Amino acid sequence: TRVASGDRLVLIAPGYDECEPSRSPVRSRVERGTRPPNESPGTEVVRRVLVLGWNLRVPALAAEFGTYGDERYEMQVASKVPVSEREALLKHGPTPSPSVTLTHVEVDFTDPEEMQALGPGTKDSVVFMGADWTDSPEEADARTLMGSLMIDEPLREGARRPTVIMELLDPDNATLVSRSRGELIISPLFLSHLLTQIALRAELQSVFDELFAVGGVEITFRPVALYTQSRPFSFEELERAASAVGETALGVRARSTGSVELNPPKTKAWDDPSDRDLVTLVTT
């Protein structure tokens, strides 16, 4: 992409001072390609997702899954909300892609027997959605926390553990969730951060629209081993490897701790690629 007069750059930095033009010599040009890393054309991946709970974000989630061209999703939604109400809301939302198979089950996932019947251990991902039909955010979070506790021990004893994602509505409840039990999203806190950023810099809305809208550009994690087998390996090496396949390297995540280092120094190096994921910006 050539930068034209009037274009504005999107920079990732610790603060505004670090966004000033550098006086250091310009690095050599990095070639940019388009081929996804280590993927065979036409290979379709089937992912099984169990969604526990229902709110107005579930239709958008199904639509987002449908934007991944080489992946097919079998999405099962379990909630106390009547299936007829869910289907009525789906008709007014984004049309799911044919690559997404959506099935509904009307159950109370806080009941141990009904949770076991859903077979969370057989899924690739388990997503707890904060219920919007309860009397309060606290009650919705209580259901999410109860459900996560019920599946925690069986999943730990299983041969493979699915990815667990929990949506909470009250930030005060975040301390009740151990990182080892899954990834955590606090929707109101996340939205407040976005609104604050947009209020300070209105032009950032176009960036967030691109990142969070269905399709387009997204941030994802991919194993470092897809980009390099070097020991040690530097972030500059990852930048070049990602650019060669049409991606933009943003940082590195340690799998063992879940910690993320964004925009590290180019010379920063790590020893073991098997314990690291690349945080990368990709186009779906």
Residue ranges and their predicted role:
Residues 1-284:
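Cytosolic regulatory regions of ion transport systems
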